[in-house]
Amino acid sequence: YLSRVFQDPKMGTAPRMTVAENLLIAKFRGERRGLFPRRLNHYKEEFQATIDKIGNGLEKHLDTAIEFLSGGQRQALSLLMATLKRPELLLLDEHTAALDPKTSVALMELTDDFVQKDRLTALMITHHMEDALKYGNRLIVMKDGQIIQDLKQEEKAQMTISDYYSLFE
């Protein structure tokens, strides 16, 4: 299946449900869910161990409704939910655009950890050239709705930020 993380931190989660409830929905994506409260209690320790690894304060909020989380915490949770069951394709649609620079860097590092650990195929849409060069292994550059450059790993490795910016001149 396809999984995605949206640009808006408010998308991709159920705001009035808790972190644990959102994770339970993600864990059983595509399956019959039934007896929700019983399953929730069964998986709480697993969910706690999972969010402990994120390290952005989310670990203190397993029983907190999503609407009370920061944008960075919501995006980290959305990413975790999107990758809890290994997707065939992870679509990242400007998923750091609404975040402050420090939170954006932390989320990109978390994204890279998930992609590398689970060997995920990810399509990241971004306007951050530095992220495209650092994390992408293939870059497709578009301008005015047209592909103007398709760079493989080897070609990308030879580029600097200045080279990349010159593609848009």
Regions found by a protein language model. Name each.
Residues V105-K117:
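Helical segment within the ABC ATPase nucleotide-binding domain
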Residues A82-T83:
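ABC ATPase C-loop
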Residues M17-R29:
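Q-loop/switch helix immediately C-terminal to the Walker
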Residues L90-D93:
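Catalytic Walker B motif of ABC-type/P-loop ATPase nucleotide-binding domains
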Residues Q146-E169:
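Conserved beta-strand-loop-alpha-helix hinge in the C-terminal portion
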Residues T50-E67:
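Conserved ABC nucleotide-binding domain
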Residues P101-T103:
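Helix N-cap at the start of a conserved alpha-helix in ABC-type nucleotide-binding domains
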Residues T126-H127:
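H-loop/switch region of ABC-family ATPase nucleotide-binding domains
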